[in-house]
Amino acid sequence: MKTAKIFWCTGMSDTGKTTLTSHAKIELEQHGFKVLIIDGDVVRKKYITQLGFNREDVEKNNLNVAEICLNERDKYDAIIVPIISNIETVRCTVRKLLSPNFYLIYLYADIASLKARDPKGLYKKADQGIIKDLIGYSNSNPYDVPEEFDLRIDTSAESDLLRSKNMFTTFITNKIFTASSLP
């Protein structure tokens, strides 16, 4: 019976969570591992009543994602969760629910880098006052920097994308290998 390692990948919007997660999934599956990605944004969109980004809605979405992880854990070698997950107390609750074999990966990028890449135009919209609660950018909606994490990757320099992908994938691969042999 499998017991997936869970990799909770947190960081502000556009730090590279989805990019690194997608790369890791491909690499791991090429080595025979069974991998599930549970994207926080995808789960958020499945609610009948659309969730916002206030503390209550973020907590609800994070806890729902954690419950999905628990329900799917015995089917996979790794579950990777790209999610903003900006509230420290909620991350601590999720860690308790999903431990053992829970790993928090913190992706950091400086604001200048985030504004420069901004593929969805979120930072521009926040600067224009169109978005008033952009997590970690708007004063009304802070991003609590994790007090404890298992891996921190600075994704500020896009030229280091290959290095970031390698760090991310190597970390996950090493954690999978510590508890199991090749599938």
Question: Where in the sequence are the language-model features?
Answer:
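Small-molecule kinase domains that catalyze NTP-dependent phosphoryl transfer to phosphate-bearing small molecules
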Residues: Y108-I111, A116-P183
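Glycine-rich phosphate-binding loop used to anchor ATP phosphates in small-molecule kinases
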Residues: E56-S99, L104, K124
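Conserved lysine of the Walker
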Residues: K17
